[in-house]
Amino acid sequence: MRLFAWVMCCLLLCGQAVQAQVRSYDQMIAAGELKVAVYKDFAPYSFEDHGQPRGVDVELAQALAKAMGVRLKLMWAPPGEKLDDDLRDYIWRSSPLHERQLADLMMRVPYDHDYAQRRNDIGELANAQVVMFGPYQQECWQVAYDRRRLDSVGSVAVFQQHPIGVEVDSVPSFYLTSVFNGMLSAKTHHYPGVSQAFKAMQAGEVDAVMAMRGEVDWQVHEAADPQLALAENAYPNMGKQRWEIGMAVHESNRQLAYAVEEALEGLIRDGSLKAVYARYGLRYEVPEMYQ
């Protein structure tokens, strides 16, 4: 019995040793530093350019920290296999891959009631330790095409004849290879990322690219090619085609969420956030909460 108690004590102590501490709002203010997790190498939202952090999410995080009177510390987050993994590693449990440091705030998290209320196999909330809040962007799917090889995109049916590029294992990939009983699959070309798909379009390998609107806007902006156009087609049988992007904090840190929401609303209403998006060539739609 004593041996069992000793083993349990050791296990508990070990668990405490590796469990990262969630900072309260007061501790964050006292430290004078807001730690924000942003996705690594995810242009135009968060990336490094000649060693300098850039991107919409980076500039928004900088503005939020400034509004709260603290400095910003970025935590570059390589995306996991699932968003649940990222929330676990950066918001509530931590990971040895980044020295078990937790972020105070994580950017680019879906602001979606159904996702937030998902249950696991035993009926518990899948992300009970996380509060998802603060929608700051509306996102949707977008097709860009080269007018030198494609006159217009009235319907995705044109991709029975014209090749289109998508990121491998993405929603556009699954959609284009399955819609219309797979009639578009032969002309759907897969690439490691959206930037590679755009390079393929510029090289003439494909006539169009489908991805998230923000990524497409950025690629078109960077290409500065007047022959690249944005389609206005619909996506039949696709399901959810528009969604909002927000942020996340630990469920015990709602005070920080309230402070961030207050700062965010000011940036949206005075046009500052729209100006950030414009600097990267992105269209900006105000989230429904602020309309």
What are these regions (language model features)?
Residues 20-109:
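Extracytoplasmic small-molecule ligand-binding "clamshell" domains
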Residues 38, 54-67, 138-183, 189-192, ...:
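Bilobed "Venus flytrap"/periplasmic-binding protein-like clamshell domains
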Residues 40, 137-142, 213, 221-261, ...:
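Periplasmic-binding protein-like
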Residues 58-67, 147-150, 162-163, 240-280:
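Extended ligand-binding regions for polar small-molecule ligands
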Residues 64, 91, 159, 200-202, ...:
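Hydrophobic residues within well-ordered alpha-helices
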Residues 74-156:
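Acidic, polar ligand-binding/catalytic clefts
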Residues 107-124, 175-179, 202-203, 207-241:
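A ligand-binding cleft/hinge motif common to bilobed small-molecule-binding domains
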Residues 172-175, 228-230, 262-291:
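Ligand-binding clefts/hinges and TM-proximal coupling segments of bilobed small-molecule sensing domains
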